[in-house]
Amino acid sequence: MSSRPQNIGIKAIELYFPSQYVDQVELEKFDGVSAGKYTIGLGQTKMSFCDDREDIYSFALTATSKLLKNYNIDPNSIGFLEVGTETLLDKSKSVKSVLMQLFGDNTNIEGVDTINACYGGTNAVFNAINWVESSAWDGRDAIVVAGDIALYAKGNARPTGGAGAVALLIGPNAPIVAEPGLRGTYMQHAYDFYKPDLTSEYPYVDGHYSVNCYSKALDAAYRAYCKREAKQANGTNGVTNGDASTKTGLDRFDYMAFHSPTCKLVQKSYARLLYHDYLANADSPVFAEVAPELRDMDYEKSLTDKVVEKTFMTLTKKRFQERVNPAIQVATNCGNMYCGSVWSGLASLISVVDNKDLEGKRIGLFSYGSGLAASFLSFRINGSVDKISDVLNIPSRLESRRAVPPETYDQMCDLRKQAHLQKDYTPKGDPSTILPGTYYLTKVDDMFKREYAIKE
């Protein structure tokens, strides 16, 4: 019997985001809010968006086709393909089925779509890894596509939008290895963010409650992860940062990526994990300056307590800049990609940090989707990621985008609203703004069938 696959994980990454963005400083002025409300309060710099020329099908087609092309992947070498998204164009037909046109005669590909707010991409990654680990595996690789177009009605939530998609090649002998058995998951019923109105792209959101749900999910998923890790107890849980007097459990992760509704929430969430370390070992010299009453604080109160937040944000400030900030460069410049968010964070990290500083390092990753579903997992860099970094080329691609004024962004939001669920429709957006190699919508016929072209 042949040996089972080893070092299963991510072998290649492609990232797509639209060619245009709105500057959050300009959006603050346009919305008439105080300076810094979006840029400092939310931690957002720019926000990607698209008009009616692009949709989740075009995003997924672009990301997947570029993954195949840029890594010279034979379409016949793919045996599993799954899509995570909450941007629905059809209540029956999957985005995955649309992508099948990229695979020619290779029709033997498992997987469909997986949906739960921003968590679908992570569930698709789990399904892909599980497939490679299973008796169903036929020796081929898997692809996961995670992406969305995040839009909100006018108001406080609109600056937390964004757009983009990530395509991941998953298989054995990967340079970014998913650490076997190390996952912690938390699932609950909650109405924090949901989309019951299928005639609209806009969600119903209880913002403060959703942040509370996110924090609870982070706590529970991290605790579940730590319990799994402790059970393994095989000597692989060593700390790579700090000495005995400065290390904490958080230091076992050299880098971290989070689902990023806003970059400010990511910063608070990283600090929250150190609070867990404090509760587990409050007598450590690391926490000598922490007020002792924080140890016995009621859990519900701790979720919103400003002293807890400020104390641990201060303690993690330097580590955040070194270990987490590289993973939010896409989020602060593109906004929230929903299902693609945490995976664009991983892409950002790989693209921004030098390969020599990544080899052999551990990456913690937290994924959250409202409603709610959340997981904490980890990867280890097992070899060079130079090829992935070169293909992603994120900093220069972000720099080459086109800024549009908030007035234009507002008009394009209205245009998408008018185009939503239309049939016998020709998009009104300007195709000249779309970059070469990008799929875009050309027509929706009277049977709702959608037609696309590739920008030459």
Curated annotation (Swiss-Prot):
Pathway: Metabolic intermediate biosynthesis; (R)-mevalonate biosynthesis; (R)-mevalonate from acetyl-CoA: step 2/3. Induction: Expression is regulated by the Zn(2)-C6 fungal-type transcription factor FgSR which binds directly to the promoter. (3S)-3-hydroxy-3-methylglutaryl-CoA binds at A35, C118, N156, T160, S210, H259, K268, N336, S370. CDD domains: init_cond_enzymes (cd00827). It comes from the Eukaryota. It catalyses: acetoacetyl-CoA + acetyl-CoA + H2O = (3S)-3-hydroxy-3-methylglutaryl-CoA + CoA + H(+). Hydroxymethylglutaryl-CoA synthase; part of the first module of ergosterol biosynthesis pathway that includes the early steps of the pathway, conserved across all eukaryotes, and which results in the formation of mevalonate from acetyl-coenzyme A (acetyl-CoA). ERG13 condenses acetyl-CoA with acetoacetyl-CoA to form hydroxymethylglutaryl-CoA (HMG-CoA). The first module starts with the action of the cytosolic acetyl-CoA acetyltransferase ERG10B that catalyzes the formation of acetoacetyl-CoA. NCBIfam families: HMG-CoA-S_euk. This is Hydroxymethylglutaryl-CoA synthase ERG13.
